């Protein structure tokens, strides 16, 4: 049976989230790298959403395809099959609901103001400073969560840590000089630890465009050239 494959964009935070989940679950998945201005017809035919990530799984005995086109669902699919780092904290199953609640707050509330903070020049109602302060409500909550532990749900990383990582990284990159002197030292340490991990380097590997050669590449491998 062929390996699953994922349509992915290198710097898309949702695709990044999905790739991190797949790598942490040690799932063998092939990557089809795309660009937003040249979406392959094959991808668009699979999901009405028309954006990455899209994971395609061949069902047993070739009985059709399973399509997963939400980044968190891709993480959960992979980790429910294999969770070698215990990101779901199976010993305390009630924590999963808390993780999902934190991720939902990130996705439903933080990301929308983060986008405005990143692209403040497109929004004429308020300044970048205004949107940054809107972001800081959630950022301060994360800082408070990290006061007693290195990760959001204890001494070890969880699903929530990896699901939020791409978006906290984006926040930190908007105005790095300001970010480095903010009163969020625990969150800075948290982000630094994640960015220094080998899995993050693998998740950010650049692959040739699938539309150029129609070749798939194994997630986690490196392409030289």
Task: Enumerate the language-model features and the residues they cover.
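Short, hydrophobic secondary-structure boundary micro-motifs
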Residues: 86-91, 114, 152-155, 201-205
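Residue-level recognition of oxygen-bearing side chains
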Residues: 73, 186, 199
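Phosphate/oxyanion-binding loops and surfaces in catalytic or ligand/nucleic-acid-binding neighborhoods
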Residues: 81-85, 174, 197
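Charged/polar, low-hydrophobicity segments characteristic of intrinsically disordered regions
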Residues: 116-118, 193-212
């Amino acid at each position: 049976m062929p390996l699953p494959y994922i349509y992915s964009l290198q710097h898309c935070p949702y695709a990044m989230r999905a790739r991190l989940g797949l790598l942490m679950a040690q799932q063998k998945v092939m990557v089809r790298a795309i660009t937003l201005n040249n979406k392959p017809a094959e991808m668009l035919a699979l999901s009405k959403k028309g954006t990455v990530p899209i994971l395609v799984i061949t069902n047993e005995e070739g009985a059709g395809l399973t399509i997963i086109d939400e980044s968190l669902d891709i993480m959960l699919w992979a980790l429910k099959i294999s969770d070698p780092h215990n990101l779901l904290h199976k010993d305390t199953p009630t924590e999963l609901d808390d993780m999902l609640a934190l991720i939902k707050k990130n996705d439903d509330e933080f990301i929308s103001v983060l986008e405005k903070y990143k692209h403040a020049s497109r929004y004429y109602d308020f300044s970048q400073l205004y949107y940054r302060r809107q972001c800081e409500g959630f950022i301060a909550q994360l800082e408070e969560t990290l006061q007693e532990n290195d990760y959001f749900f204890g001494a070890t990383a969880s699903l929530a840590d990896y699901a939020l990582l791409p978006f906290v990284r984006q926040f930190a990159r908007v105005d790095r000089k300001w970010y480095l002197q903010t009163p969020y030292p625990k969150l800075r340490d948290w982000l630094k630890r994640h960015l220094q991990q080998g899995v993050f380097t693998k998740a950010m590997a650049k692959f040739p465009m699938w539309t150029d050669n129609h070749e798939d590449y194994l997630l986690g491998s490196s392409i030289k050239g």
